[in-house]
Amino acid sequence: MSQQAETTDIKKKILSTGIRVGTQVKTKFMRPFITKASPEGLYMLDLDITLDKIKTAAKFINRLGVENLIVCSGRQYAETPIEKFCETLGSKKLLGRFMPGTLTNPSLPYYIEPKLVLISDPQVDEQAITEATNAGIPVIGIANTDNITSNLDVIIPANNRGRKALATVYWLLVRQILIEKGELKEEDPMNIEIDDFETKITEEEIE
């Protein structure tokens, strides 16, 4: 299967996940990644750019080493995707509230020195971005149409609110990282599916 055909298959697989569905707001930072507005007034992201940026992020992560990456988010729906990502690749996860000084205060017991940070939402994960920037650590961020991305080194334009969309972004990242590492061929399926990355909601939470 050619790379173009494989890309087409991937696009078909992920279109229904809402990965390209943005919000009713667009910032000047995200304008280059937006293709149009839906009839409902939601700005739509360019899926080709998203896939290209995922490849860029995967190359960046592999160059610095998955073991030197921390993946963090205060967003609930990002927890399972991050856990699966880190379980598969061996990166470190930081979920929930990002404790001040984590990247900037060596005297704290939870201080760490990663070479790269991956965040799920520039607004929710602002503390992590600020500390990484102050410490000179590059940041990869998943950003929606309404996000400010001035302190991100690599922007992955995608829906960072939806459960399935977030699962898809992290699944795509794992897949591309494994391809870059030579552990998976472009045409081969992964043994983990998007559903494995998705945060599940219980009946109690729905009620």
UniProtKB/Swiss-Prot annotation:
GO terms for molecular function: structural constituent of ribosome. Keywords: Ribonucleoprotein, Ribosomal protein. Signal peptide: none annotated. GO terms for biological process: ribosomal small subunit assembly; translation. Pfam families: Ribosomal_S2. CDD domains: RPS2. InterPro entries: Ribosomal_uS2, Ribosomal_uS2_arc, Ribosomal_uS2_CS, Ribosomal_uS2_euk/arc, Ribosomal_uS2_flav_dom_sf. One of its GO terms (cellular component) is cytosolic small ribosomal subunit. HAMAP family: Ribosomal_uS2_A (MF_00291_A). Belongs to the universal ribosomal protein uS2 family. NCBIfam families: uS2_euk_arch (TIGR01012). This is Small ribosomal subunit protein uS2.
